[in-house]
């Protein structure tokens, strides 16, 4: 069973140790859909506020801006590279083994870094190779590639061998895919990044990851407030409002604390300084077991991110419960 021995760093953000000994801050800044100057500004403000864990991906299209922000904060003496934990992800059109190292090198060049702290396989299924990140046929259907993620993983392991990244992991992998990958992996994944929030608590998958010594990072930890997906915003529920009032916190802070107390590292996305500050102020209180159970009962299992256009692909991860 994985030991979640937590150490305290700046801004009182705990860290968790990977199976390989490296450590990851248990809260980070998510940057999906944060573009250009917004992404750079958010990263700089986050670092000033005590964030040390920054999450991005090649698919987000903001690696260069994030890299510029990181360099600026290093140059002004706010942090050193060793203080930071930087994650990015391999996109689906580069799943062939021989494409993985070049893709990692491209992300490093974009970020202006010599190494990554964590490199993830963004999704278990592959898309047609080429420059188009979302390849589609004339009917608008996604074009699948038949590359097996087991092959992709060999390329990920080579990234470690070449010193391009300290750790490697997966994202959006289900329990069966994790088991199959571990059967052949020479370097085990240290992390699985999945959607985790009060609506989708992922208890069974998180438990499986823990038993396999795989840490979990939670994206969309606030669900999708104000979204157009038809998913009820549980942050406004009486349960969340009452718990927030008791702790003198916001419902969003309660939601993030809930994810954290499940031993999942939330990576909330924001480009608003006040919210970035609010999101890191979750380590000075604790939810009771009754409060955790009350929040747990709010879940319906609905996903914000379902990538439904790929639901018929061989390695689509969401066709089983977990």
Feature names for model-found ranges:
Residues 64-75, 104-108, 156, 178, ...:
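Short, well-ordered amphipathic alpha-helices
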Residues 100-121, 158-162:
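CE4/NodB-like, metal-dependent polysaccharide N-deacetylase domain
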Residues 125-322:
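Beta/alpha (TIM)-barrel catalytic core signal, keyed to glycine-rich beta->alpha loops juxtaposed to Asp/Glu
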Residues 80-94, 118-124, 193-196:
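A short, structured active-site edge motif that brings together acidic residues
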Residues 1-9:
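N-terminal amphipathic/basic-hydrophobic helices that include classical n-h-c signal peptides
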Residues 52, 114-117, 166, 190:
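Short acidic/polar active-site loop segments enriched in Thr and Asp
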Residues 28, 55-58, 117-120, 169, ...:
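Residues embedded in well-ordered beta-strands within globular domains across many folds
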